[in-house]
Amino acid sequence: MIEAVLFDMDGILIDSEREYDKAMREAITRYGHIITDEFLLRVRGIPVEAFKKSLKLEFGRDFPVEKFRNDFKSIVWQNIRQYGMPVKNGVYQLIQYLEVNNIRYAVATSNDRGMAVELLEAADLRGVFEYMV
C-alpha cells in the first residue's frame, strides 16, 4: 500500500524546465554565446553551485555568472507573468486521488526555497503540499 508520494516539482508538476530552457537561451545571447541542447541537459536539475561551475567551464572563467543568473531569472519571471506557469497534465487529478485515498504527498526541488514557493504560486499550487524538500 502506498503511504506517501514525493513529487519532483520541475518537469513533473510544472513545466518549468521548458521555461528555464527558453530563458537561458535568451539570456545567453546577451553575452554573445549560444547554449546547446547538450548543455541544457547536463545542467538540468543540478544544484546552483554546480550550475555556476558548469557555466564557467562552458563559457570561460571570466563569464559573469551572477549577472547571467539575474538576467535569466528576470526573463523567467517576465515570461511567467505574461504567460503563467504551465501545470503538467493530470497533476490536479492525481492530487485529488491522493487526498480521497488519504495518501500524504510532498514536493521536492533543487531550486532554492524562495524560488520554489514563487513557482508553485505561479502555477496555483502554493499551499497544496504539506512539505517541501
Predicted regions and their residues:
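Active-site neighborhood of HAD-like aspartate-dependent phosphohydrolases
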Residues: 1-41
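Metal-dependent phosphoesterase signature
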Residues: 34, 56-92, 101
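A short, structured active-site edge motif that brings together acidic residues
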Residues: 39-44, 70, 125-133
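Short alpha-helical
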Residues: 19, 50, 86, 93, ...
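Substrate-recognition "cap/lid" segment bordering the active-site pocket of phosphatases
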Residues: 84-86, 106, 112-133
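Helix-loop "lid/cap" segments that line or gate small-molecule binding pockets
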Residues: 27-28, 47-62, 119
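Substrate-recognition element of Asp-dependent hydrolases with the DxDx(T/V) motif
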Residues: 24, 91-120
